[in-house]
Amino acid sequence: FGADVIKVERDDGVGDGTRSLGWRDPTDDVTLWWKLIGRNKRTIVLDLKSTEGRTNLLRLAATADVLVENFRPGTLERLHLGPTELHEQNPDLVITRVTGFGQTGPYAQRAGFATLAEAMSGFAGLNGEPDGPPLLPPIALTDEVTALVAAFATMVALHSGRGQVVDVNLLESMLQLMGPLPAAAAALGYDQPRLGSGIPYSVPRGTYRTKDEQGVAISTSSEPVARRVLELVGLGDDDGLRTSAGRVADRARVDEAVSRYVGERTAAEVIERFVE
C-alpha cells in the first residue's frame, strides 16, 4: 500500500532467521523465504541493548506511523522502549504487538509458535480421518493468518488517527479463523469429530478418487448445487436427502454414492459433467 517499511534485524551477524531457512534461489543463493519476508523493505541492524541502538530506534519511531514488534511481553519495557517511551517521542504512533498468547494472561510469558496455536486452538484436532490422529497443516498457517489479522487491525488503528497499542496473538487469530466452532464448544459442549475432508453441516463435501487416480474436490454448500450432485450420482429422487439435515444424517450413504460415481469416471469426465 505504498508504505516505507524499515525492518530492524538483530546485531548478531546472522540477522533474520528466514535468511537461512529453506530453499535457495539457484540464481543468487538467497532463500525464497527471505525473498518473501524481506521484499519491498529497507533493512537495518540495531543492538537494542545498547544506548546507541535504543536512541536510533526512538529516532525512527519519532517520525513513523507504525511500529510492529513480536518480542515476548515486557521485553520492550525492559529495554526502555515500551509504549510509554515510544509515545513520548510520537503520541500518534500505532504500536502493534504480536505474541503467542497476548500481552496479559497466564500464558503471556510463554514462547509462541504456529504449531502451538494450531494444536491449542483445537484446529489440529479437527483435521484428519475419523480413525486417525490430529493433523497439523503442512504450511505455517498460523503465521500467515496472524499477519493478516495484525495488518488489518493496524490499518483500523491508523484510520482512527489516534496513537495506541494493538494487541494481536497467534492463538486468538486461529480461534477466529475457525468461525462458530469455538463458540459451539463453549456454549453447547460441541466436540466436532474429525471428518477427513468433510464438514459437519454440508454433505457431500470432500475429495474423491477418480478412475485415472486423480483427486477431485466436491462441495455442496448451497441447495441447488446439492440437488444437482444428487441427481448426477443417482440419489435425486430420495426424499430423505432433500434437506441439508437429511444429507448430514445420512452422510455415509451419500459419500459412498459420490465416491462410486467419481471412481467410475476419469477426472476430465467428472469435471465435464459437473460444469454442464
Where is each model-derived feature located?
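N-terminal helix-loop segment corresponding to the beta1-alpha1 unit
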Residues: 1-158, 189, 194, 268
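Short amphipathic beta-strand starts and helix->beta connectors
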Residues: 30, 199-204
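Active-site-adjacent beta-strand anchor residues
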Residues: 47, 69, 167-171, 218-220
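Conserved Rossmann-fold dehydrogenase catalytic segment
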Residues: 103, 131-139, 160-174, 193-200, ...
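Oxidoreductase and adenylate-handling cofactor-binding alpha/beta cores
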Residues: 147-165, 176-188, 228-237
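Aromatic-enriched alpha-helical interface/lid elements that frame and gate functional surfaces
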Residues: 204-276
